[in-house]
């Protein structure tokens, strides 16, 4: 996995009422949710969301999460929010959001405890690693026990700019299994099979624009950070990430969405689960890892409208996608770029829950996935 998972941004909502006066003049009245108003009703909201996935790489994993949102006298747009979830494969997760009353600053607390079934794929380092197609999928799987705590503080600099400062305290322990590929790379007494603690610091700068009606999203994000092994402080590394994403609207129903992302590690003292990787949808997770990575994926999306039925509002659409990317690793000479291609269908019901079916192929094989829910 990539070395940093940034917190999701939280929108700030403002109610705007417009009144018509004499002489065709207009005034705008804003109700600022973050101001104290004793007439506001104090209440809380509890919601439940199913969450599941079937993936030809990961297998089946079902779960759910509960969201508790408190609306006090001061809101931006709420007073605070807790989300607690469990997934059969990933384990327990918690996400807390605590916005400042002016709506311009937010504190995030994220934590997770992996389940005993949690794993990551490991195929070795480099851009030319073998796919081990003749082996069973378990051969490249590594059971990984993790505990993570990741606080972050986010502030709005200007209307379209957000700055996030984050920290991390993580624990990893890879399970030693004799008949797995990892055992051929790391010796029996290698520290990778012991409990390792890591501390990290970093910052992310994000710009999100909506410049034109035909370009409703243009976003760039830059991250710089540093991680250190607490048991072996000499094993530490700085890193940087950058991404650029956009949506182009050709019509009300036809859009093009794309994301480019690059990762650079500035030292060699990292573990395989901290390496730079590429998310190509036709390959297994972490199929290629290294010291630097770059990839781009793009989708053409067609909104097919609504399906009439007597039970629930149902929207659906089609998409086709193409991905490419590669990694770089010291001492390896490779000119290969990896590609994947495919498509699928998505369904939204109750205007809230989404299911997505996708199929993507590559030089290794193909990957089929079915997703349900909103994600965590």
Annotated model-derived regions:
Residues 2-9, 13:
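Single conserved hydrophobic/aromatic residue that forms the stacking wall/gate
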Residues 14-110, 164, 174, 178, ...:
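Outer-membrane beta-barrel initiation region
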Residues 40-47, 69-77, 126-135, 177-189, ...:
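Flexible, solvent-exposed coil segments and beta strand-coil junctions
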Residues 44, 92-93, 139, 186-316, ...:
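C-terminal outer-membrane beta-barrel translocator/porin domains of Gram-negative envelope proteins
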Residues 49, 77-79, 106-110, 162-166, ...:
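Residue-level detector of the transmembrane beta-barrel scaffold of outer-membrane proteins
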Residues 52-59, 68-70, 82-88, 111-119, ...:
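Transmembrane beta-strands of outer-membrane beta-barrel pores
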Residues 53, 120-126, 135-146, 176-182, ...:
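Extracellular/periplasm-exposed beta-strand and loop segments of Gram-negative cell-envelope proteins
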Residues 347, 365-376:
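Outer-membrane beta-barrel "beta-signal"
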């Amino acid at each position: 996995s990539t070395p940093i998972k940034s917190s999701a941004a939280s929108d700030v909502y403002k109610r705007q009422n417009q009144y018509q006066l004499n002489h065709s003049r207009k005034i705008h009245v804003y109700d600022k949710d973050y101001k104290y108003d004793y007439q506001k009703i104090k209440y809380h909201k509890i919601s439940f969301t199913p969450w599941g996935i079937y993936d030809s790489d990961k297998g089946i994993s079902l779960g759910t999460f509960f969201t508790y949102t408190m609306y006090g006298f001061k809101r931006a747009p709420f007073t605070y929010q807790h989300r607690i979830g469990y997934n059969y494969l990933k384990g327990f997760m918690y996400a807390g959001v605590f916005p400042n009353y002016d709506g311009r600053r937010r504190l995030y607390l994220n934590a997770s405890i992996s389940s005993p079934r949690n794993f990551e794929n490991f195929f070795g380092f480099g851009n030319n690693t073998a796919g081990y197609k003749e082996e069973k999928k378990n051969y490249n799987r590594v059971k990984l026990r993790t505990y993570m705590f990741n606080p972050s503080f986010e502030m709005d600099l200007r209307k379209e700019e957000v700055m996030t400062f984050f920290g991390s305290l993580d624990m990893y322990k890879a399970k030693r299994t004799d008949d797995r590929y990892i055992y051929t790379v790391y010796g029996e007494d290698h520290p990778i099979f012991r409990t390792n603690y890591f501390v990290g610091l970093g910052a992310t700068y994000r710009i999100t624009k909506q410049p034109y009606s035909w370009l409703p999203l243009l976003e760039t994000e830059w991250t710089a950070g540093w991680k250190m092994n607490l048991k072996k402080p000499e094993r530490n590394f700085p890193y940087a990430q950058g991404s650029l994403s956009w949506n182009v609207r050709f019509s009300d129903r036809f859009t093009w969405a794309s994301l480019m992302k690059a990762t650079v590690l500035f030292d060699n003292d990292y573990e395989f689960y901290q390496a730079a990787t590429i998310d190509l949808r036709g390959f297994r997770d972490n199929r290629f890892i290294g010291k630097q990575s770059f990839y781009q994926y793009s989708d053409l999306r067609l909104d097919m409208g609504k399906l009439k039925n007597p039970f629930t509002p149902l929207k659906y659409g089609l998409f086709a996608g193409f991905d490419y990317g590669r990694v770089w690793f010291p001492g390896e000479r490779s000119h290969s770029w990896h590609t994947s291609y495919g498509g699928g269908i998505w369904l939204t019901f109750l205007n809230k829950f989404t299911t997505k079916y996708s199929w993507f192929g590559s030089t290794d094989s193909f990957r089929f996935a079915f997703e349900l829910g909103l994600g965590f």
